[in-house]
């Protein structure tokens, strides 16, 4: 079916009907990704048509997903990623003011009708959607009256208003910073207060911005977001060392320890890998071993082994590291295998079986044989087994007949 606005036959349109998806999230996630890909492909040749398609998708996505199970957060994350990509498409389109205002009206209505809500993020990105300061200022004027009531410290007046975030984002894009700070002066909710922090920083009052952000910490505050905003303020001031020391770890926390290390190392290219690792390890007391993969990936093999020995480390991760380094770093392979056996002997690891014992032992033994230290290696394995009652019962049983000196 063709879009009524542009005549383009969007494939996603038929798929994103009201209540189109059942409770399973994966089919919906796949369709969301396909729709974004379809729109971005068109954007290469016709950015106006693509932007109109992006608006159409954002109008239809929430009603289509009404029955999808969102408890895991997967579908919400997929939609948020789609919103970020499509906002960029809309913002980049060389549209005239009338066309852009029409898009904004459509998105505003979609956001107002968003019951789940799936497209709530649009409010945060309203400044980007406005593109120009003039359009943003008109939206700020339109929304600021109700927003003042919604943000009132008087509980009799205060309430939720779907246009609040659009108002704050519009004020910021319009560079009406002082007005934004004044509006949010009594505000406690961080999701709103962060705009005052951004405004103060934009006004050059960066020390004041940092103080406001730090004073906003609390049980209902997103600590990672506070750290990211503070880090951004310091980096924009050229205070790299202070940003690194105070905020790098919390601001760049990712889904895995390895991903976190890579994010920090990428953002701070002047910092040596050893320094990045030290800062991150210090930020997670008691979790030293979980940084093993990050240290290994950075080529800090001695540090990786030291971390793995300090606190429990996944034996399978250690065994894979031993396997992968037999030829190029046999000393490391030996140590990784031995540490894996040690943690298994102590009872660590999820549903460990005899296969996991062999996975740790075999590459380490091969590496030792390559170096001519097989006798010493077997002695160290026997020492591990003898140190723990459970280890003697399990690891020793699995490796029975393998540890003679002959």
What feature does the model see in each segment?
Residues 1-406:
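Eukaryote-biased, non-catalytic alpha-solenoid scaffold regions
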């Amino acid at each position: 079916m063709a879009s009524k606005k542009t005549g383009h036959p969007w494939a996603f349109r038929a798929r994103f009907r009201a209540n189109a998806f059942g409770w399973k999230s994966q089919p919906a996630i796949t369709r969301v990704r396909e729709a974004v890909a379809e729109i971005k492909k068109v954007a290469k040749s016709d950015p106006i048509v693509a932007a109109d398609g992006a608006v159409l998708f954002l109008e239809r996505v929430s009603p289509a997903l009404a029955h999808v199970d969102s408890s895991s957060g997967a579908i919400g994350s997929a939609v948020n990623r789609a919103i970020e990509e499509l906002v960029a498409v809309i913002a980049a389109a060389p549209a005239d003011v009338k066309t852009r205002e029409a898009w904004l009206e459509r998105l505003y209505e979609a956001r107002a009708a968003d019951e789940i809500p799936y497209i709530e993020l649009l409010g945060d990105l309203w400044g980007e959607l406005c593109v120009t300061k003039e359009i943003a200022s008109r939206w700020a004027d339109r929304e600021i009256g109700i927003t003042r009531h919604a943000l009132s410290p008087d509980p009799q007046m205060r309430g939720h208003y779907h246009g609040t975030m659009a108002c704050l984002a519009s004020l910021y894009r319009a560079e009406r910073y002082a007005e934004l700070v004044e509006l949010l002066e009594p505000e406690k909710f961080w999701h709103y207060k962060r705009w005052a922090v951004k405004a103060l920083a934009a006004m050059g009052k960066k020390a004041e911005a940092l103080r406001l952000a730090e004073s906003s910490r609390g049980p209902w505050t997103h600590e990672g977001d506070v750290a990211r905003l503070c880090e951004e303020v310091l980096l924009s001031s050229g205070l790299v060392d202070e940003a690194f020391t105070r905020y790098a770890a919390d601001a760049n926390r990712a889904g895995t320890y390895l991903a976190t290390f890579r994010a920090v190392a990428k953002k701070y290219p002047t910092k040596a890998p050893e320094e990045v690792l030290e800062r991150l390890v210090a930020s997670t007391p008691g979790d030293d071993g979980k940084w093993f993969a990050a240290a290994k990936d950075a080529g800090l093999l001695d540090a990786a082994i030291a971390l793995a020995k300090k606190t429990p480390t996944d034996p399978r991760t250690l065994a894979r590291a031993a396997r992968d380094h037999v030829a190029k770093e046999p000393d490391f392979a030996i140590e990784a295998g031995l540490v894996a056996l040690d943690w298994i002997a102590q009872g660590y690891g999820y549903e460990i079986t005899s296969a996991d014992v062999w996975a740790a032992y075999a590459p380490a033994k091969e590496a030792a044989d390559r170096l001519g230290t097989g006798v010493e290696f077997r002695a160290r394995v026997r020492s591990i087994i003898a140190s723990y009652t459970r280890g003697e019962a399990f690891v020793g049983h699995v490796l029975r007949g393998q540890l003679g000196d002959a």
